[in-house]
């Protein structure tokens, strides 16, 4: 029995979703691979696109595309990029008319959170910030064993509480939440419980200076080569 194909855009070489055609032409999916979502789910795509007809959603999407456009410029040398993400954050928040911003950060990035808060305040925003250890709840509360504590079994260690972070952000009624360096998994919970518009300034990567793509760029090197090694069945 043939294996049912799933969506695999990452392995597509055709890119029919971004064709090199004129603006008045109609994109074709004739060359789309069988795993292309434009082949597999045309009705779903049509239904989802209708969401952009909602005025608030349409305007948000429009502003996001304008922001994308403004981050590039054509020069004599060709196309070049213009702004780092922190400047984009400021520009986009201004475009949206946001005034109050909320930073949910990892305590390990306290210095970065302070710097970010100062920068945003200097740009005229009201800024609140809440760290991951808010509540000072012991890790034992979620079933962590003494030997699983980073500080050691004999010491107190507060659990990271992204749910509390999210609820504080919610009750503060910020216009935009900014996630800064939350651990993997903790970021997932924050996203699940946050009920206001949210963006990510940086994610946690303890080895690469919070730049996880560095591991991909170095995945063929001696040190990171283990990332490209295929797992044997016995390792599963």
Language-model region placement:
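An N-terminal assembly and electron-transfer interface module characteristic of large anaerobic redox
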Residues: 1-236
């Amino acid at each position: 029995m043939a294996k049912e194909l799933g969506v695999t855009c990452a392995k597509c070489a055709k890119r029919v979703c971004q064709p090199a055609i004129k603006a008045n032409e109609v994109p074709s999916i004739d060359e789309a691979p069988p795993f292309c979502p434009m082949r597999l789910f045309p009705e779903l795509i049509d239904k989802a696109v209708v969401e952009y007809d909602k005025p608030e959603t349409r305007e948000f999407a429009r502003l996001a595309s304008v922001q994308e456009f403004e981050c590039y410029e054509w020069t004599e040398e060709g196309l070049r990029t213009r702004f780092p993400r922190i400047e984009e954050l400021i520009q986009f928040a201004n475009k949206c008319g946001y005034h109050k911003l909320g930073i949910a950060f990892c305590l390990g990035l306290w210095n970065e959170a302070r710097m970010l808060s100062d920068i945003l305040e200097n740009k005229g925003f009201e800024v609140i910030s809440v760290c991951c250890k808010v509540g000072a709840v012991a890790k034992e509360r979620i079933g962590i064993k003494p030997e699983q504590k980073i500080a050691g079994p004999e010491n107190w260690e507060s659990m990271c509480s992204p749910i509390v972070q999210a609820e504080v952000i919610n009750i503060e009624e910020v216009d935009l939440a900014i996630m800064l360096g939350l651990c993997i998994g903790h970021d997932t919970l924050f996203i699940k419980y946050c009920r206001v518009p949210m963006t990510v300034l940086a994610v946690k990567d303890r080895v690469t200076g919070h730049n996880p793509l560095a591991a991909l760029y170095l995945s063929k090197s001696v040190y990171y080569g283990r990332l490209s090694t295929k797992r044997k069945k016995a390792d599963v």
